[in-house]
């Protein structure tokens, strides 16, 4: 089954494709207080919700990058409907291959919930710091361990113990790079339940509407496995947060 088709189906009901909520995203947008025309880059932008809200609230310019053709198409549709005059572009590409026109040229550089693009949280912070201007913002969304992960969970989820750090370790990774941690938006159990539950719901609706899709057996199997892993271990083992860092002034 095509990877991006899978995520398009399972995340079809999500506005934000991460285990956070729209209220927290709105608070992040309000917190930033960006000037009109500020330049923003969002790596692995999903359906473009962060960029669109920043354009609506502050009149920013920006580029969103994502490897999913389904998400880029949805982001373009939303841009045309909500901010048709905004200088916002969405680009279909691997975020790791994105190269800004100049280093340290963006007021905001973000990668929320997709550190796998760069090979982990610390590498993501390195990449974003290289894009962010002096006194700019580096924003990362990242899981963290709530407790020592059971071996059964690691096997079921296909993870290793060093896949994530603690909440404090995620924050300290930015501070070691000279970034100032100014805020975190930590997800609740309800945020996680909504994120996971919408995937189950969307899958069920898709199965009912497309009974002849040859990908249904794989789709059902993957979602059922992920559901069981989440309910047995994941909900009590993995947290998630948006980390908001400020760069040093020039």
Regions found by a protein language model. Name each.
Residues 49-97:
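Class I SAM-dependent methyltransferase SAM/SAH-binding core
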Residues 44-48:
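Class I SAM-dependent methyltransferase "Motif I" SAM/SAH-binding loop
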Residues 18-36:
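Conserved alpha-helix/loop element of class I SAM-dependent methyltransferases that forms part
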Residues 100-109:
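A short acidic, Gly/Pro-enriched loop at the edge of an enzyme's catalytic core
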Residues 163-178:
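Short alpha-helix
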Residues 143-161:
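Short, glycine-/aromatic-enriched active-site segment of Class I SAM-dependent methyltransferases
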Residues 183-250:
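Conserved Class I S-adenosyl-L-methionine
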Residues 122-137:
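A short glycine-rich, Lys/Arg-flanked "PGG" loop and its adjoining helix->strand segment in the class I
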């Amino acid at each position: 089954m095509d990877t991006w088709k899978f995520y398009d189906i399972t995340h079809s009901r999500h506005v934000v494709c991460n285990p956070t909520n729209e209220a927290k995203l709105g608070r992040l947008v309000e917190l930033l207080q960006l000037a009109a025309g500020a330049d923003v880059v969002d790596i692995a932008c999903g359906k473009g919700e962060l960029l669109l809200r920043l354009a609506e609230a502050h009149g920013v310019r920006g580029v969103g990058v994502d490897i999913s053709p389904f998400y880029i198409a949805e982001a373009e549709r939303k841009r045309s409907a909500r901010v048709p005059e905004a200088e916002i572009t969405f680009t279909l590409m691997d975020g790791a291959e994105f190269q800004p026109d100049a280093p340290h040229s963006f007021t905001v550089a973000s990668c929320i919930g997709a550190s796998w693009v760069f090979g982990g949280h610390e590498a993501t912070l390195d990449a974003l710091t290289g894009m962010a201007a002096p006194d700019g913002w580096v924003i990362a969304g990242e899981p963290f361990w709530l407790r020592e992960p059971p071996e059964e969970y690691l096997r079921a989820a296909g993870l290793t113990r060093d896949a994530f750090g603690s909440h404090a370790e995620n924050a300290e990774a930015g501070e070691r790079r000279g970034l100032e941690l100014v805020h975190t938006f930590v997800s609740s159990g309800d945020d996680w339940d909504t994120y996971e539950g919408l995937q189950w719901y969307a899958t069920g609706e898709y199965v009912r509407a497309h009974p002849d899709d040859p990908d249904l057996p794989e789709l059902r199997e993957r979602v059922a496995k992920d559901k069981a892993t989440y309910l047995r271990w994941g909900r009590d083992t993995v947290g998630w947060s948006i980390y908001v860092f400020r760069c040093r002034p020039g």
